């Protein structure tokens, strides 16, 4: 019976393959966004996975007709711009249409997704956007007709914050950042570091807001991810280049998942842990050199590649005022 069922399925697939245009669909890909556990103060929080996992992919075929003149089909560059825009706008359902003269990568959906989260220098994009996405499901359909490839890519996205909450963050961040305009880079870092440590309390609730800039800024309570994302957003709004780094850190002899920033001053970057700066011994991890910082902070592999290290060179020594 099983053999007969399998034979019928194979026959059906072959019929679809030779019946003109057809859709080549990748099974849904489930990519869980980074959600960090926290390690400062009481270490009360549960550890969540840092790295997303992709499910195995299988192929199914479905007949579909598509006009090759359909204006909704754009280039990859246009679709990348659209995807980034829709993610910033917290769209939960995103559909992209891409036309190509040649077959594109089987990882098209995930490739576009990761490219949309790359560093751009815009305050609410890049790392800030990346770490505010909780989960995304991806499905890709391919229609082949008249030697043209028509891709339809569906994204279903779960965010840590809503557009309304992000609008409130933007409003408050702009007001705070405006107070440091005209100051030097180091003065901006100092003042914004002090703002975060003075206004945010370390703590954890069961909702996603503890892991967001909104939780840190509006609720005034967050874990390390919330601290780091708020600091990232404030610095970017003030014109100070920085990246969010994830990894592990050791405190009280225990290694836990953690997040911090690297901040550009001059031609090099310095490690900076705003969460740990909010302690009874403040600012011990302020613009630190990597030679000492790496004694208890260990970046994930993606931040230790030759390309990343070359792009973001870390100072081996602590920052010294000129």
Question: Model segments located where?
Answer:
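Catalytic cysteine-centered active-site loop
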Residues: 203-214, 221, 242-254
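Alpha-helix capping and helix-loop boundary segments enriched in small/acidic/polar residues
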Residues: 83, 164, 219-222, 251
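Short, surface-exposed secondary-structure junctions/capping segments
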Residues: 283-309
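Secondary-structure boundary elements
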Residues: 163-216
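Hydrophobic/aromatic-rich core segments of domains that either
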Residues: 226-293
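N-terminal accessory/pre-domain segments preceding catalytic cores
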Residues: 3-183, 299-322
């Amino acid at each position: 019976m099983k053999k007969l069922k399998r034979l019928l399925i194979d026959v059906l697939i072959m019929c679809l393959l030779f019946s003109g245009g057809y859709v080549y669909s990748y099974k849904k890909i489930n990519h869980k966004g980074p959600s960090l556990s926290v390690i400062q103060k009481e270490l009360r929080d549960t550890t969540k996975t840092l790295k997303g996992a992709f499910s195995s992919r299988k192929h199914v075929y479905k007949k579909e007709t598509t006009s090759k003149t359909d204006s909704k089909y754009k280039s990859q560059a246009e679709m990348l711009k659209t995807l980034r825009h829709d993610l910033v706008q917290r769209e939960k359902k995103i559909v992209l249409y891409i036309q190509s003269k040649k077959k594109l990568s089987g990882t098209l959906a995930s490739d576009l997704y990761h490219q949309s989260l790359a560093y751009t220098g815009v305050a609410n994009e890049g790392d800030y956007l990346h770490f505010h996405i909780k989960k995304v499901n991806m499905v890709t359909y391919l229609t082949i007709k008249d030697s043209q490839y028509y891709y339809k890519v569906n994204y279903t996205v779960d965010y840590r914050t809503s557009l309304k909450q992000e609008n409130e963050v933007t409003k408050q961040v702009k007001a705070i950042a405006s107070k440091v305009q005209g100051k030097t880079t180091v003065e901006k870092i100092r003042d914004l570091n002090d703002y975060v440590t003075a206004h945010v309390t370390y703590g954890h609730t069961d909702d996603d807001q503890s892991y967001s800039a909104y939780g840190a800024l509006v609720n005034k309570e967050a874990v390390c991810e919330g601290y780091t994302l708020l600091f990232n957003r404030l610095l970017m709004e003030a014109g100070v280049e920085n990246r969010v780094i994830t990894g592990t850190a050791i405190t009280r002899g225990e290694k836990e998942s953690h997040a911090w920033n690297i901040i550009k001053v001059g031609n090099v970057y310095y490690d900076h842990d705003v969460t740990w700066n909010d302690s009874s011994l403040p600012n011990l991890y302020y613009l630190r050199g990597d030679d000492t910082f790496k004694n208890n902070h260990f970046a994930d592999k993606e931040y230790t590649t030759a390309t990343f290290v070359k792009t973001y060179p870390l100072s081996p020594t602590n920052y010294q005022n000129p």
